[in-house]
C-alpha cells in the first residue's frame, strides 16, 4: 500500500480550528492543541447558552411585565390569568415591549383584563 501523508488534511484541519479560535487570548489562539481544547469548550458553551438565552429572556420579560403591572395596581399572576380569561393572546415578549415603550397601550390592556376579573 502507498504511504499516505497528512500534510494537506492536517493544514486544513488546523486552519479550521485556528479560525474558530480567533479572538481568544494568547496560546489559546496561537497553539493548535490549546486552541482545539478551547474551541471544543466554547462550542459546548454556545450550545448550552443558546438554550439558556430563551430562559433568560422569558425571565426578563416577566420582570418587566410585573413592574408595569404593579404600577397599574395588579399583580403579574392575576394579570396573566385575566388575559387568558379575556382571550387576549399577546405573548410575554410583546407585553414586555408595550410595558417598556408604550405605557398607555399597556394600561389599556390592563384595563381590559381587569374588566374580566
Curated annotation (Swiss-Prot):
GO terms for cellular component: ribonucleoprotein complex; ribosome. SUPFAM superfamilies: Ribosomal protein L20. InterPro entries: Ribosomal_bL20 (IPR005813), RIBOSOMAL_L20_CS (IPR049946), Ribosomal_protein_bL20_C (IPR035566). Gene3D superfamilies: 6.10.160.10, Ribosomal protein L20. The keyword RNA-binding applies. GO terms for molecular function: rRNA binding; structural constituent of ribosome. It holds the Pfam family Ribosomal_L20. Belongs to the bacterial ribosomal protein bL20 family. Binds directly to 23S ribosomal RNA and is necessary for the in vitro assembly process of the 50S ribosomal subunit. It is not involved in the protein synthesizing functions of that subunit. This is Large ribosomal subunit protein bL20. The gene is rplT.
Amino acid at each position: 500500500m502507498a504511504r499516505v501523508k497528512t500534510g494537506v488534511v492536517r493544514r486544513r484541519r488546523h486552519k479550521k480550528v485556528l479560525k474558530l479560535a480567533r479572538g481568544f487570548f494568547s496560546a489559546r489562539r496561537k497553539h493548535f492543541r490549546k486552541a482545539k481544547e478551547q474551541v471544543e469548550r466554547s462550542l459546548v458553551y454556545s450550545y448550552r447558552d443558546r438554550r439558556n438565552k430563551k430562559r433568560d429572556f422569558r425571565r426578563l420579560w416577566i420582570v418587566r411585565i410585573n413592574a408595569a403591572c404593579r404600577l397599574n395596581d395588579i399583580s403579574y399572576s392575576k394579570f396573566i390569568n385575566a388575559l387568558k380569561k379575556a382571550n387576549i393572546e399577546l405573548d410575554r415578549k410583546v407585553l414586555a415591549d408595550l410595558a417598556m415603550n408604550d405605557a398607555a397601550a399597556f394600561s389599556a390592556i390592563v384595563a381590559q383584563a381587569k374588566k374580566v376579573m
